[in-house]
From Swiss-Prot:
It catalyses: 5-amino-1-(5-phospho-D-ribosyl)imidazole-4-carboxylate + L-aspartate + ATP = (2S)-2-[5-amino-1-(5-phospho-beta-D-ribosyl)imidazole-4-carboxamido]succinate + ADP + phosphate + 2 H(+). This is Phosphoribosylaminoimidazole-succinocarboxamide synthase. The lineage of its organism: Bacteria, Bacillati, Bacillota, Bacilli, Bacillales. It comes from Exiguobacterium sibiricum (strain DSM 17290 / CCUG 55495 / CIP 109462 / JCM 13490 / 255-15). GO terms for biological process: 'de novo' IMP biosynthetic process; cobalamin biosynthetic process. CDD domains: SAICAR_synt_PurC (cd01415). PROSITE patterns: SAICAR_SYNTHETASE_1 (PS01057). The keyword Ligase applies. Its EC number is 6.3.2.6. GO terms for molecular function: ATP binding; phosphoribosylaminoimidazolesuccinocarboxamide synthase activity. Belongs to the SAICAR synthetase family. Keywords: ATP-binding, Ligase, Nucleotide-binding, Purine biosynthesis. The gene is purC. InterPro entries: SAICAR_synt/ADE2_N (IPR028923), SAICAR_synt_PurC (IPR033934), SAICAR_synth (IPR001636), SAICAR_synthetase (IPR050089), SAICAR_synthetase_CS (IPR018236).
Length: 235
């Protein structure tokens, strides 16, 4: 097992199968493109278990992902993909940068979900980009971009009612996609409270990384609460 890549929240390693990678989830939390950092014992285990569970939920709904299996509390095996340098953000309720950018009050429910694309480049601050920008940058074809939007909406159609049944509102979330050597586009990266905004339907309590971003609560306690609310799934 050789190290391949280390990101803000995960380490990637090769395996004996060239088409399979091992992901190890770290305890580090970051915000504001890495400007704010801290470590929380147990975070990696919680995110691994939650991500594994969400990918299983999506796979059961017929959505193709890179996930193969969870192999330990902190590790999982995934199909090897080349990440498309776009963050695909799906918004159901106004929050975060959308509120600041358009001057709309946080908590405003959108009539229909909004899908946005952000160029994955830390040096540029991951800017919001339009289809014309994406074409200019040669990141994805028009057909691929249409597929990404369609697939992101499919993920939303599965996860939104899933959380709703648990008394949680899926405010917004970030997805990343990658291509297999054969050119198949798969949902990749992770789905966790690091990448989703989740609010308690009754109290409005944040059940995601915003407690760290905004210094409004304990990250580990929040993630553990979410894990428990979902029935302790992820094994």
């Amino acid at each position: 097992m050789q190290p391949l890549y280390e990101g803000k929240a995960k380490r990637l390693y090769t395996t004996q199968d060239q088409d399979v990678l091992r992901i190890v989830y770290k305890d580090e939390a970051t915000a504001f493109n890495g400007e704010k950092k801290a470590e929380f014992a147990g975070k990696g285990e919680l995110n691994n278990r939650l991500t594994s569970h969400f990918f299983e939920v999506l796979a059961a709904a017929g959505i193709p992902t890179h996930f193969i299996e969870q192999t330990s509390e902190r590790e999982q095996l995934v199909r090897r993909v080349t990440i498309i340098p776009l963050e695909v953000v799906v918004r159901n309720v106004v929050a975060g940068s959308l509120s600041k950018r358009l001057g709309i009050e946080e908590g405003t429910v959108l009539e229909t979900p909004i899908v946005e694309f952000y160029y994955k480049d830390d040096s540029l601050g991951d800017p919001l980009v339009t289809p014309a920008h994406i074409n200019l940058l040669k990141i994805a074809t028009t057909e691929e971009l249409s597929l990404l939007e369609q697939e992101a909406n499919r993920v939303n159609d599965v996860l939104r009612p899933y959380f709703d049944e648990k008394g949680i509102t899926l405010i917004d979330f970030k997805l990343e996609y990658g291509k297999t050597p054969a050119g198949e586009i798969l949902l990749a990266d992770e789905i966790s409270p690091d990448t989703c905004r989740l609010w308690d339907k009754e109290t409005g309590e944040h059940l995601d990384k915003d407690v760290f971003r905004r210094n409004i609560g304990s990250l580990i306690d929040t993630y553990q609460t979410l894990f428990n609310r979902l029935g302790g799934n992820g094994q």
